[in-house]
Amino acid sequence: LGDVYKRQAEGYLRAHGAEDLLILSRGEYPHAFINRPTFRRIEKDDLFVFSVEIAGVYGYWTQIIRPIFLSRGSHREAYEVLCQVKEAIQAGVEKFRPGNLICDVDEAINRVARKYELSKGVWAGHSMGIDLGDGYNIGESNKMEIVPNMILTFHPSLLDKNGEGVLYADTYVSTEGGARCLTDKYRESPYWEDLKELVK
């Protein structure tokens, strides 16, 4: 069903002004990685990760990734890691302000990962702009200074000791007053029954 959802999402997004888009998903373990949607059937207790990267009418890209738990109480370890990923993102967002460096953002994310003894992938996110990915990553080697109106998508790939993780992403713009989220929809709950109510 992943491919079915992809087609429905693409139709909706294009009807609402998306010029270009990339839709990726994941319906099986490990949930910290995404790929092209497949024809794998989604089961009632599944955890389904859905990523949408959209270019609007002016050509600028944004990205949102949301995990969807098909039943409440399933995938408890994954849910726990999801909460930790959100905490790590928030720590990074607090450092995403003009005058700091990209590596400061990465270190804030790393502190949360260490607190929960999570392993971290190569990066914690990337820039967004006129080109998808726009050329630089959130990583410890990136000494680039953060400037006003810089845009980053945060999606640290954090894994617990069993290799479980959940990809989640929001896109932010840096401002003098702090980072502002550009993808603040569907953050209240990761559960399908709650999300259905939000989109009615």
Where do the language-model regions lie?
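Active-site neighborhoods and metal-handling regions in enzymes and metal-associated proteins
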Residues: 2-200
